[in-house]
């Protein structure tokens, strides 16, 4: 089936859209992909409803209609008729994730999107897992396993979006997955506050600074790091502690220290793997930050490479994953497992909407 995936990540950079030919078990063909950035007003609107606050209903409608325009423009640019696309996997945008309270909230109106684009839509991928007692995240490991078929294992696939998450894959295909801690969110928010740009471009700010090692050690005392995987965390969980620890730092030293926070959390996560990995493959925006990649390489014992080293598109991977998960959902296949979200049993998920 030709499936389309849409992802709006916690980094708030934009909408990733990708096409994938898949049966929900294997990947037959990668299709085109692109990212459409958010404007400042859209980013501010989304930030304003984080935590479920503010005018959620209006923001959700605007957010959904923006996705619809992204899809129409993307298909037109590729010369693809919407009638040839079997399903669209619509992640939405996470504004609240509190699995301990059995609550997770991804805004995005699946019925409205289906009506606007004329393609069946699957959305709300996380709620069933959370309702069953799982973490509702990460969701991408089953797609990682499909991609990694044929690669030497054990290996780790690290996604550095707003939050960091990792999938450990053994040579027999068994999985362990969890959120490592902060990804780019701390650094992005620091860069925005100190430079007016929502990202530390090429890690230049961090490269000019010095890491406060005492702050890194103190950061790792956050209670999240005492929890055993599978586990997941909200984008903003670490902000209060992080800001306290870098208070008074220069823009450069703060960026260097926040980069070190993320890398140290990943290094700590590696101790939870059943067996050491032979390599780390990094996807998400963090892989484009040379300072982040250097910090990871220093802290990890196996080689660290971007996913492009094995021919994958790191900018498209999460959107592709939601195309893959949408096909699995339509077929009633499992999306999550005890080893990936901590749910008591494998779970399917997603809500289906027809145009």
From Swiss-Prot:
The keyword Transferase applies. Signal peptide: none annotated. One of its GO terms (biological process) is 1,6-anhydro-N-acetyl-beta-muramic acid catabolic process. ATP binds at residues 9-16. Its EC number is 2.7.1.170. InterPro entries: Anhydro_N_Ac-Mur_kinase (IPR005338), ATPase_NBD (IPR043129). Pfam families: AnmK. Catalyzes the specific phosphorylation of 1,6-anhydro-N-acetylmuramic acid (anhMurNAc) with the simultaneous cleavage of the 1,6-anhydro ring, generating MurNAc-6-P. Is required for the utilization of anhMurNAc either imported from the medium or derived from its own cell wall murein, and thus plays a role in cell wall recycling. This is Anhydro-N-acetylmuramic acid kinase. It comes from Paramagnetospirillum magneticum (strain ATCC 700264 / AMB-1).
């Amino acid at each position: 089936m030709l499936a389309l995936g849409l992802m709006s990540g916690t980094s708030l950079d934009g909408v990733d859209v990708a096409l994938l030919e898949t049966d929900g078990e294997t990947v037959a063909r990668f299709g085109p992909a692109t990212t459409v950035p958010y404007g400042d007003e859209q980013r501010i609107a989304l930030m304003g409803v984080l935590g479920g606050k503010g005018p959620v209903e209006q923001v959700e409608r605007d957010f959904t209609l923006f996705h619809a325009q992204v899809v129409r423009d993307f298909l037109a640019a590729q010369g693809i008729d919407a009638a040839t696309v079997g399903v669209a996997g619509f992640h939405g945008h996470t504004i609240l994730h509190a699995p301990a309270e059995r609550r997770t909230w991804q805004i995005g109106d699946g019925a409205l999107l289906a009506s606007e684009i004329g393609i069946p839509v699957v959305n709300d991928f996380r709620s069933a897992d959370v309702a069953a007692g799982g973490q509702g995240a990460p969701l991408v490991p089953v797609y990682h396993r499909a991609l990694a078929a044929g690669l030497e294992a054990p290996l780790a696939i690290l996604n550095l979006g707003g939050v960091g998450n990792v999938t450990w894959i053994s040579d027999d295909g068994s999985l362990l997955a969890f959120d490592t801690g902060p990804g780019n969110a701390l650094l992005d928010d620091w860069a925005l506050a100190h430079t007016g740009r929502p990202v530390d471009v090429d890690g230049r700010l961090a490269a000019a600074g010095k890491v406060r090692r005492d702050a890194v050690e103190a950061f790792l005392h956050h209670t999240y790091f005492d929890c055993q995987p599978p586990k997941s965390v909200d984008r903003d969980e670490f902000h209060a502690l992080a800001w306290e620890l870098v208070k008074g730092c220069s823009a450069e030293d703060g960026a260097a220290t926040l980069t070190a926070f993320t890398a140290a959390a990943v290094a700590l996560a590696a101790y939870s793997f059943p067996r050491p990995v032979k390599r780390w493959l990094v996807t998400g925006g963090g892989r484009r930050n040379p300072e982040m990649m250097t910090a990871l390489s220093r802290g990890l014992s196996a080689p660290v490479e971007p996913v492009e080293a094995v021919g994958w598109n790191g900018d498209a991977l999460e959107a592709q994953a939601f195309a893959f998960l949408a096909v699995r959902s339509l077929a009633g296949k499992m999306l999550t497992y005890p080893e990936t979200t901590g749910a008591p049993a494998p779970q399917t998920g997603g809500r289906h909407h027809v145009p």
